[in-house]
């Protein structure tokens, strides 16, 4: 199967240039200023358009069983929404239940995804329990047969997913040994649990209780703590869904000291804020429930985008985990029972373009970096993914920077009945999405085939991650001080009949006079 993209401007993370792109059997086979079409070759006209690498969303939760419900976007609907928005690969999370084998959970996720995906996908593994067997299974799943190169640790959701600090630290030591990336959901789960109990007992049962139970300081504290522990373990760390300025500042602090830390803001946090939690319409407020919550500071979205521009944050994701209005309403009398999660996989690319490029904060090359290339590099599938180059997979988007669209639940492809970006007009629209040489989105219509996507194994030892770790490790090697053997001085026992003199002095503490013996 072949196709030719003509007259476009190729945008990679490091260059922009006009060129044609020839695709054959799922790969890019030629890039040249002008390629003549052969008879029968399908041609995509990209005049006045950008030709960019397909987006990579490194953080999704398709059909996740969570809080007694199952996320509505399964691997079919979720990946259809992805390609409609210009994303051609997702990285989803295998999340075992407490005490469950990683291998059993892995097989379950592959069984869900393989028959349904319409684009390529990879997997990351959550560690929800700890012990020697888990450590052994971590090593197993980093082998080529499984293709896992990152492990996520939750410092929230006490009693469900959360691990203790010592378990987190031991897990990071194992990650470092395996040359795998540690990822962290950074919140203070113990304090959150106490705050939830206090708020409920005080009569605060609505969605506003969610954000009040999770003040930004707790995200910042947990992020700082996680970075500190990762630094001690000399383990690279990837902080998922950075939602606040404080968390971003914690990452920047440790990076300046040489720690290898990556920060991931998400579409929701770049486009809207936590004022929704105080909306008088209960259901409106509940739709935005996620953890960590959206920042109550309205300047945060713009600040996070500027940190992406400055390289203090590194790539964008969505944490796509969708629950419909009925599922959200299960927590109508108790905010802790509202399923956590929002949409984003369809709208991320347009949101980042609108809030970043159209706003004049980032350029098109940086857009490609934070929506595709950095994810490919960090998760070790570059340049197969994340680049327009000969030999790369033909995951390509023809992008119209001048077009606009209005986001709506009535036109999106998610399996839910609302959209957190409802009514937002965004600049930048994917006109054509190509997955491994197949057009899957064009003219506003899906052309997908269920199960046509493929699993992409992600090998450990990413160069962009571990080259810095290795350099840092040399400076952190323990230093032994060579000393002459210490010879203790033997003291003679005191004479029991010797007079013992006790010296005293007066001390005058505030409020009175006292004689204190020393």
From Swiss-Prot:
Zn(2+) 1 binds at residues 59, 61, 152, 319. Its EC number is 3.5.2.2. GO terms for molecular function: dihydropyrimidinase activity; metal ion binding. Binds 2 Zn(2+) ions per subunit. The modification N6-carboxylysine is found at residue 152. Carboxylation allows a single lysine to coordinate two zinc ions. NCBIfam families: D-hydantoinase. This is Dihydropyrimidinase 2. It comes from Caenorhabditis briggsae. The gene is dhp-2.
């Amino acid at each position: 199967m072949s196709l030719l993209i003509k007259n476009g401007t190729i945008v990679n993370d490091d260059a922009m240039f006009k060129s044609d792109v020839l695709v054959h059997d799922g790969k890019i086979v030629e890039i040249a200023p002008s390629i003549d079409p052969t008879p029968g070759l399908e041609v995509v006209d990209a005049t006045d358009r950008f030709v960019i690498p397909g987006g990579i969303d490194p953080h999704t939760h398709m059909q996740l069983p969570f809080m007694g419900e199952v996320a509505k976007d399964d691997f079919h609907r979720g990946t259809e929404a992805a390609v409609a928005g210009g994303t051609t690969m997702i990285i989803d999370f295998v999340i075992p239940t407490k005490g469950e084998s990683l291998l059993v959970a892995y097989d379950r996720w592959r069984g869900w995804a393989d028959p349904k995906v319409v684009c390529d996908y990879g997997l990351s593994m959550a560690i929800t329990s700890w012990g020697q067997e888990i450590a052994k299974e971590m090593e197993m799943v980093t082998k080529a047969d499984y293709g896992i190169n990152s492990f996520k640790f939750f410092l929230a959701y006490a009693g469900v997913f959360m691990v203790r600090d010592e378990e987190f630290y031991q897990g990071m030591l194992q990650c470092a040994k395996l040359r795998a990336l540690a990822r962290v959901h950074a919140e203070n789960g113990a304090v959150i649990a106490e705050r939830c109990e206090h708020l409920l007992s005080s009569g605060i049962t609505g969605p506003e209780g969610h954000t009040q139970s999770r003040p930004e300081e707790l995200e910042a504290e947990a992020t700082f703590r996680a970075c500190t522990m990762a630094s001690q373990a000399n383990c690279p760390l990837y902080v998922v869904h950075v939602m606040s300025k404080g968390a971003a500042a914690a990452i920047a602090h440790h990076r300046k000291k040489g720690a290898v830390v990556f920060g991931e803001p998400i579409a929701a946090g770049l486009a809207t804020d936590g004022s929704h939690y105080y909306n008088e319409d209960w259901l409106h407020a509940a739709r935005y429930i996620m953890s960590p919550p959206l920042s109550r500071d309205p300047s945060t979205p713009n600040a996070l985008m500027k940190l992406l521009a400055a390289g203090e944050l590194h790539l964008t994701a969505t944490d796509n985990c969708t629950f419909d209005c009925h599922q959200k309403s299960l927590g109508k009398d108790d905010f802790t029972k509202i399923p956590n999660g929002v949409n984003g996989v369809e709208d991320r690319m347009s949101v980042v373009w609108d809030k970043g490029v159209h706003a004049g904060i980032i350029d098109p090359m940086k857009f490609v970096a934070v929506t595709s290339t950095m994810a490919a590099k960090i998760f070790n599938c570059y340049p197969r993914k994340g680049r327009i180059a000969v030999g790369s997979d033909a995951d390509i988007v023809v992008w119209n920077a001048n077009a606009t669209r209005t986001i709506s639940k009535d036109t999106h492809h998610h399996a839910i009945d609302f959209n957190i970006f409802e009514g937002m007009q965004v600049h930048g629209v994917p006109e054509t999405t190509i997955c491994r040489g197949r057009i899957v989105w064009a003219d506003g219509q899906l052309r997908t085939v269920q199960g046509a996507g493929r699993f992409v194994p992600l090998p450990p030892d990413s160069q962009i991650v571990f080259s810095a770790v290795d350099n840092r490790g040399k400076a952190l090697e323990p230093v032994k001080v060579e000393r002459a053997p210490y010879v203790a001085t033997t003291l003679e026992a005191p004479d029991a009949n010797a007079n013992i003199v006790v010296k005293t002095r007066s001390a005058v503490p505030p409020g009175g006079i006292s004689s204190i013996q020393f």
